[in-house]
């Protein structure tokens, strides 16, 4: 949609139409809501001043990219947002050349812009990268690594700091407080402009040195001093919902031909009163009633997250040395209950996974028992810290990995597929997974008493109810759930246990089912005994096949020179998994029990 010839009035009408479209579709389909409503005028300004098909448009995380999708030939297709086979909820170059880069994890945008700007300079192209980044993403260290180089190179990059004073959760830390202070002094920029005019008008040519020194001294009260001292110009704060001001400011920033931060104040949920000013409830939503804002809730069993949260709270009440941390996901990981109950022992450190892990390593060294509550996909962001600061020291840190396996509508950037693969080869690390609510509760007590670093994984949503009385967790010990007479053996890990049980129920043979429990260390004694009885082994796990559960067992069979076992692993193949309803995604991968039973002859 070309909007460059539209009048201001037409643009304002379009902003209303965009909001209406987002509210209508998201109310029926679900999706990221309040952040994207707050970014409508900023997005229109970007499209008016820049060219989305030429200038690199880079949306950090891209929770706020829905208006951009609607402006780039996806208005009708927007009905399919986050649905299986439909539009992604994030920017995705496969969808449109207007989507410069895949996004989903935070704080990558400015680094991408630096790389794009370097390339533009080398290729002698007339383009300017334009970034939209939220105040929540500004808490991550990668942002300042990028700003550090950008300020040094003086490359032309325009960065819109979309400051709604809310990330997904309540904003945390000194950076957030700094930005809030800037907003509190929002009239600074006009004051500075008046002083600049006074200097130019009243100081003769020979006093430019004095004028320069005055300007340097003036920076001491500049709200953007943090950025200006890094060599990046700062404009703002501006009203991010005033289209005229947004467009004029972006035109100025583009013409400056150097790095510029445009600090825009916006309201999260703008245009839908019920959502305005809400931190978490309206960030990512399911279907809701537009008239009253009531969510259309389906009856659902207690989620694994809720079970974990209650169990960790009980553990914290029992043991005073239990502490915990999350990286900007207190509600998503369930640690919010503990932050309310024990604010001196549980922290949200904002989007700072590396810091979260290393700081908890120090607490473990001091005798505390840290629980790092984190989504599987975000644990990737602290990989070096896991090795260098936790496992090398063999410190008893517990990584509680939520959203392990397929996560549904968030898609390929958020699937919890890789944690087993990248944790399994680290010395000292213990990996285990509960199969249901009862074993999840048990696993936390076990983790507390373990003197090694360990990682527990559990899925998004609820475990399937299983009718097995759990035995106590013992390090490196599996559990036989059912003994059959077939020469086949089903081994499940974590949520994969229920898939093994369901597949066995559909099969015409009486098959033994084992809950592996530990992928590291393996129960080698039991596996050795099982290899004497069963020749065809089938592995069920919600994880990547490469270096996954099947690989661990194959390594064991090879090391023990066991050659009579034929092993088949039902894990994720070597490709990224698309978004959509979990059952539809599993069906596309051939992982439903009714599909698996056809593969087991």
UniProtKB/Swiss-Prot annotation:
Keyword Transferase: yes
Catalyzed chemical reaction(s): D-glyceraldehyde 3-phosphate + pyruvate + H(+) = 1-deoxy-D-xylulose 5-phosphate + CO2
Pfam families found in the cross-reference section: DXP_synthase_N, Transket_pyr, Transketolase_C
Cofactor note: Binds 1 Mg(2+) ion per subunit.
Cofactor: Mg(2+); thiamine diphosphate
Binding site for Mg(2+): 135, 164
Enzymatic class: transferase
Record-linked SMART domains: Transket_pyr (SM00861)
Pathway: Metabolic intermediate biosynthesis; 1-deoxy-D-xylulose 5-phosphate biosynthesis; 1-deoxy-D-xylulose 5-phosphate from D-glyceraldehyde 3-phosphate and pyruvate: step 1/1
Key words, A-Z: Isoprene biosynthesis, Magnesium, Metal-binding, Thiamine biosynthesis, Thiamine pyrophosphate, Transferase
EC number: 2.2.1.7
Annotated family: Belongs to the transketolase family. DXPS subfamily.
Role, per record: Catalyzes the acyloin condensation reaction between C atoms 2 and 3 of pyruvate and glyceraldehyde 3-phosphate to yield 1-deoxy-D-xylulose-5-phosphate (DXP).
The protein's assembly and partners: Homodimer.
Protein name in the entry: 1-deoxy-D-xylulose-5-phosphate synthase
């Amino acid at each position: 949609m070309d909007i460059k010839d539209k009048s201001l009035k037409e643009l304002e009408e379009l902003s209303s139409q965009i909001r209406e479209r987002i509210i209508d579709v998201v109310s029926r389909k679900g999706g990221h809501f309040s952040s994207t409503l707050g970014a409508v005028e900023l997005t229109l300004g970007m499209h008016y001043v820049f060219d989305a098909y030429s200038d690199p448009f880079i949306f950090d995380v891209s929770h706020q990219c829905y208006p951009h999708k609607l402006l780039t030939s996806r208005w009708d297709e927007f009905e399919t947002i986050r649905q299986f086979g439909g539009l992604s909820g994030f920017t995705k170059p496969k969808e449109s050349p207007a989507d410069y880069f895949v996004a989903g994890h935070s704080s990558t945008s400015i680094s991408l812009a630096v790389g794009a700007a370097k390339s533009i300079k080398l290729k002698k192209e007339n383009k300017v990268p334009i970034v939209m980044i939220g105040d929540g993403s500004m808490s991550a260290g990668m942002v300042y690594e990028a700003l550090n180089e950008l300020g040094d190179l003086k490359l032309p990059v325009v960065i819109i700091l979309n400051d709604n004073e809310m990330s997904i959760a309540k904003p945390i830390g000194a950076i957030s407080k700094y930005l809030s202070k800037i907003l509190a002094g929002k009239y600074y920029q006009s004051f500075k402009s008046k002083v600049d005019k006074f200097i130019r008008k009243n100081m003769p040519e020979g006093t430019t040195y004095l004028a320069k020194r005055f300007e340097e001294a003036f920076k001491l009260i500049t709200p953007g001093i943090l950025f200006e001292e890094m060599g990046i110009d700062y404009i703002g704060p501006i009203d991010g919902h005033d289209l005229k001001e947004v467009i004029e400011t972006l035109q100025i920033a583009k013409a400056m031909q150097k790095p510029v931060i445009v600090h825009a104040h916006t309201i999260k949920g703008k245009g839908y009163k019920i959502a305005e000013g809400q931190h978490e409830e309206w960030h990512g939503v399911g279907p809701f009633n537009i008239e009253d804002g009531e969510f259309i809730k389906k009856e659902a069993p207690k989620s694994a997250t809720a079970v974990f949260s209650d169990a960790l709270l009980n553990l914290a009440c029992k043991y005073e040395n239990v502490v915990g941390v999350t990286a900007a996901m207190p509600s998503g990981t369930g640690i919010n209950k503990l932050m309310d109950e024990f604010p001196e022992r549980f922290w949200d450190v904002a989007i700072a996974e590396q810091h979260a892990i290393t700081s908890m390593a120090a607490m473990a060294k001091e005798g505390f028992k840290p629980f790092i509550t984190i989504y599987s996909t975000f644990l990737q962001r602290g990989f070096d810290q896991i090795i260098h600061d936790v496992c090398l020291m063999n410190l008893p840190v517990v990584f509680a990995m939520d959203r392990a396996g397929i996560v549904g509508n968030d898609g390929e950037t958020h699937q919890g597929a890789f944690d087993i693969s990248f944790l399994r080869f680290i010395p000292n690390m213990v990996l285990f997974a509960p199969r249901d609510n009862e074993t999840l509760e048990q696993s936390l007590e076990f983790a507390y008493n373990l003197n090694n670093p360990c990682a527990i994984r559990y899925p998004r949503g609820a475990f399937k109810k299983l009718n097995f009385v759990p035995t106590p967790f013992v390090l490196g010990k599996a559990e036989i759930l059912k003994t059959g007479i077939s020469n086949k053996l089903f081994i499940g890990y974590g949520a994969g246990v229920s898939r093994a049980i369901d597949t066995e129920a559909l099969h015409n043979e009486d098959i033994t089912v084992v809950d592996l429990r530990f992928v590291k260390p393996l129960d080698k004694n039991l596996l050795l005994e099982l290899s004497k009885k069963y020749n065809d082994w089938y592995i069920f796990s919600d994880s990547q096949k490469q270096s996954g559960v099947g690989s661990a067992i194959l390594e064991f069979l090879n090391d023990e020179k066991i050659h009579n076992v034929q092993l088949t692993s039902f894990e994720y193949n070597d490709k990224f998994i698309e978004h959509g309803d979990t059952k539809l995604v599993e069906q596309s991968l051939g992982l439903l029990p009714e599909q698996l039973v056809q593969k087991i002859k």
